[in-house]
Amino acid sequence: MALAALAIGCGIAAIVYWRWPSPPSAPVRVAIRVACDDPARCALAESLALDVWTEGGRPGLPFDIVVASDSLAVLDAHHIAWTVVVPDIDAAARDEAERLRRPAALRPADWFAEYHDYNEISDHVRQLAQLAPERASLHAIGASVEGRPLWALRIGGQRADATPMLINGTQHAREWIAAMTTTCIADHLVRAYDTNAAIRDFVDHTELWVVPVVNPDGYQYSWGNDRYWRKNRRGRHGVDLNRNFSIGWGGPGSSKNERAENYRGEYAFSEPESIALRDLVKREQVAVHVDFHSYGQLVLYPWGYTSKPAEDRDRFAAVGDDLASAMFVTHERRYTLMQSVELYPAGGTMADWMYGEARAQSFTIELRPDRWSGGRQGFVLPPEQIRPTCDEGLAAVLALRQAHDLGR
C-alpha cells in the first residue's frame, strides 16, 4: 500500500492516510476521508459525493464522503488528499446482513455482542422494566410517522429532588451504535443497582429517561432496505429529525430540498418523533441531556447554528472536558471536545433546542469510530466494539450528572 501522511492544525494530531495500490476492477461506492485547505478543492470533492458521512467546518478538518470509485482519479488529478474509510460500502453492508442472519443458536450469549433491530430493542427495554418495576418503567411517549411507538424507559426518580435527565439515540437511522449504547446504559443501570455503589447513587438521585430509538421507522428501514438511510420515513425522502427543532431551524447546515440528507422538514416540529421528544422534555422539565450519535469520537456543546459563543460556554467547556476525560479512562479512546459549530454549522438540532428553549445542559456525543486516525469502519462498526462503546457512554452520563450535582 502507498502511504502518505498529512498533519492538520487546530490541535488535531497528524492523520495517516492509507491508499489502495490500485482501484477496484469495477466501480463501487467507496467511503473516503478527504482533507483539503483550499475551499475550491473542498467544493470539488463535495460535488463528487453520493453521500456525506461526516462534515468538516474547520480549515483542514477531514470529512468523510461516499463517492463512486471511478471518481477517485478526479481527486488525484486535483491533488486532493484522500484515504479509504470503507473500500466498498455495499459489500460491508452485505457482510453485516449475512452475519445478522445467523440462526439464534449461533448468536453470542451476550445480548450486547451483536446489533439488534427495533423490535428486539423494544423487547429488551420492556424486560428491563419488568426486571426492576420498583425503579424502572416503560412509556410510549409518542408514535412515529409509520405508527411505531417511541419507547422511553424511566429509571429512578423515586426522590422528589431527583435530577430529570434524558439520553437518546438514533435520530439518524444508520447510527446503530447509538441505539445499542443507550440500551446498554439502561441495562447496566438496572442490573448493577444492587452491586455497584456508584450506579445505585446515580439511580437514587436521578430521574433518567432513555429513548434508545428516536427514529424507529428509519432504523427499521436501515435493517431491511438501505443500511445507510439517515432520515425518518416521511414521504419518499424523509426528514432529518436533528434539523427539525425550532432553535436555528432553517439555518445553516440544513436544507429545504427534501432529497437532501439534512432536509429540515416543512416547518419546525413537523415530525411526530421530534414532537414526542419536545413534549417529554417539557413535561418532565429535563435539566440534563445527552444526544448520542455516530461517528467521530466527539463531545459537542451548543451552539451549532451560530458561531456566537453560548452564554454558558465556559461551563460547557469545563463539563465537556470532564466527560471526555471520563470516557478516555475506560478504554483510552480519546474524545475531542469542541463547540458544535466548530465541527460544522447545523440549524435546528436537538441539543441547541434543549439549551436554548428548555434551558437544559445538553451535549451531543459522537461515538466510535474516530475520525482522526484513519479508522476504516464508518457506520458499520464491528459488534465487538458495542460493549466498550457502551462503557464510554455510561462514563459520560455518570460524569455529567456528577458535574450537575456539583453545580458546574
Where are the regions a protein language model picked out?
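M14 metallocarboxypeptidase catalytic domain recognition
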Residues: M1-L3, G9-R408
